[in-house]
């Protein structure tokens, strides 16, 4: 008979599966509480790293339609429920597993597809979403910047051919007539003060 506590736990795990775009199943045998806390901090706020009961997790996974963990729920199990950037979370997990051999990445899923441990490592090797977006923005911006440079080069070439002063020389040329106007006004003012 299911107790209210177990029913609540299954509902919470089911909800975690449904809200996550990815999850990674790990075995944490031998990790200290301090190490688990360090791992949770490195994963960030968009990833929930939860120690789970295997039987309850199997029920919750079935209810959520996640088949990636079939046959993998054995031993001390913890799951990283990833709601944000799956690449960054997978990278944090694999980096932590490299320095803490007690954490074993068993399997995972990403956007409904089951992943084995090597595929989780391959996901971690991808560039982060922010870096990918920055590259796309750079690619989109490059043609406009190149066009602006070409237009500016053509303008400079035309100015040289026509003998017009370059844009940098234009302000100096404009200042000269203003200085001449000031000189012509100064003698007129001097003459007016002499007459008085």
UniProtKB/Swiss-Prot annotation:
Tell me the InterPro entries matching this sequence. Answer: Ribosomal_uL10, Ribosomal_uL10-like_sf, Ribosomal_uL10_bac, Ribosomal_uL10_bac_type, Ribosomal_uL10_CS_bac
Q: Name one GO cellular component term.
A: large ribosomal subunit
Where is the sequence biased in composition, kind Low complexity? 164-196
| Keywords, ordered alphabetically | Ribonucleoprotein, Ribosomal protein, RNA-binding, rRNA-binding
Gene Ontology terms: biological process: translation
- HAMAP family assigned: Ribosomal_uL10 (MF_00362)
What does the UniProt function comment say about this protein?
Answer: Forms part of the ribosomal stalk, playing a central role in the interaction of the ribosome with GTP-bound translation factors.
Name of the protein in its database record: Large ribosomal subunit protein uL10
Q: Which organism is it from?
A: Arthrobacter sp. (strain FB24)
Q: Which gene encodes it?
A: rplJ
């Amino acid at each position: 008979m299911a107790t209210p506590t177990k029913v609540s736990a299954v509902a919470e795990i089911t909800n975690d599966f449904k809200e996550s775009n990815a999850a990674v199943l790990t075995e944490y045998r031998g990790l200290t509480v301090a190490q688990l806390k360090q791992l949770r901090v490195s994963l960030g706020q968009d990833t929930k790293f939860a120690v789970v009961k295997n039987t309850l997790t199997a029920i919750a996974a079935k209810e959520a339609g996640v088949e990636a963990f079939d046959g993998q729920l054995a031993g001390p199990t913890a799951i990283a429920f990833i709601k944000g950037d799956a690449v960054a979370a997978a990278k944090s997990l694999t980096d932590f597993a490299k320095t803490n051999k007690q954490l074993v990445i068993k399997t995972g899923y990403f956007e409904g597809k089951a992943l084995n441990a090597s595929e989780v490592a391959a996901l971690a090797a991808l560039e982060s979403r922010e870096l990918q977006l920055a590259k796309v923005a750079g690619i989109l911006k490059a043609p406009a910047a190149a066009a602006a440079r070409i237009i500016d080069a053509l303008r400079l070439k035309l100015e040289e051919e026509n003998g017009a002063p370059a844009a940098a020389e234009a302000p100096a040329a404009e200042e000269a007539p203003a200085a001449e106007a000031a000189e012509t006004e100064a003698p007129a003012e001097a003459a007016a003060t002499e007459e008085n």
